[in-house]
Amino acid sequence: MTQSLLLDAARSKPVARPPVWMMRQAGRYMAEYRALRDKYGFKERCENPDLAVEISLQPFRAFRPDGVIMFSDILTPFDGMGIPFELVESRGPVIDPPIRTREQVEAVRPLDPEASLAFVRTILQTLRREVGEAATVLGFVGAPWTLAAYAVEGKSSKDYALIKQMAFSEPDLLHALLTKFADAIARYVIFQIDSGAQAVQLFDTWAGQLNPADYRAFALPYERRIVEQVRQVHPETPLILYINHSAGLLRHVGESGVDVMSLDWTVDMAEARAILGPDMAVQGNLDPCVLLGDQAQIRSRILDIVEKAGPTGHIMNLGHGILPSTPEDNARFFFETVKSLAPVSAR
């Protein structure tokens, strides 16, 4: 029942309660994870199947969420595309040299997941065996605008001025890079589903840095390009889209073709539902900082979101990843509260 719960909600089918999982549910707030972090580098944790499976399963064993997401990073496919990068603890990704010239864009290779990402297949196949029918196994990828933001900036950024400069001065160059990324990521999503992922989340985290017109020019077409290619091979697999600070883009995201819009906490759930309409499921959208507060407040906020989301087409989650300073007991309370909700018919 638990496995189908998340998939049914993603397809807006009736469910007894909202399924629940948590972005970054395998992470630094867990003592078990910190023990492995102290022994192994981040990239090794992502690419060593034994480590990635163990880390993915830590929150599953502790909290029994309805979704188990593969431990990985959105930049993982970069190596296979000829884009060297490092994942530096507490600093994030570093791409050196960053991609800023036509020659560099032309040098980006097509992605062959079978050749460069075989470890991802092993991770997902193992997770499916370990989880069985108890939860849905999720894969995830970065969407083209967000991947390009890292590739052009060379690291995380506060204002994304360099990629926006490219967008506004050399748009053809940026479109060429985005097209390469979209086709690569479409292949990667298909590969993840072939390997056992039952749903896949697209992280276009930094598309929220764009105004609606620029989102429609530089992000939305490439999200849609991925979805269309995946649908040709796996038409039934739910696809989820996450954009941080997406409130100003909600009137447009439906054109991406995804099944579920994952909302950050800055938009009211009822307002988001009204804008998105009845045909798109939603995910979210508790402020991660609420989990730093007392449990009465956590419960109150959960109930408010669930009520506003309505009885179908809602996956409970945070509005962004769980914070490293979150008490494990509060994470446990979050899961237990959602899982203990009365059936929809009894509310």
Swiss-Prot record:
Catalytic activity: uroporphyrinogen III + 4 H(+) = coproporphyrinogen III + 4 CO2
GO biological process: protoporphyrinogen IX biosynthetic process
An annotated Gene Ontology molecular function: uroporphyrinogen decarboxylase activity
Enzyme class: lyase
Keyword Oxidoreductase attached: no
Keywords: Cytoplasm, Decarboxylase, Lyase, Porphyrin biosynthesis
A Pfam family assignment: URO-D
Coiled coil: none
Keyword Lyase: yes
Pathway of action: Porphyrin-containing compound metabolism; protoporphyrin-IX biosynthesis; coproporphyrinogen-III from 5-aminolevulinate: step 4/4
InterPro entries recorded: UROD/MetE-like_sf, Uroporphyrinogen_deCO2ase_HemE, Uroporphyrinogen_deCOase
Its EC number(s): 4.1.1.37
Marked site (Transition state stabilizer) residue numbers: D73
Residue positions binding substrate: R24, Q25, A26, G27, R28, F42, D73, Y150, T205, H320
Location of the protein in the cell: Cytoplasm
Gene Ontology terms: cellular component: cytoplasm
Quaternary structure note: Homodimer.
Similarity field: Belongs to the uroporphyrinogen decarboxylase family.
Function: Catalyzes the decarboxylation of four acetate groups of uroporphyrinogen-III to yield coproporphyrinogen-III.
Identification of the protein by name: Uroporphyrinogen decarboxylase
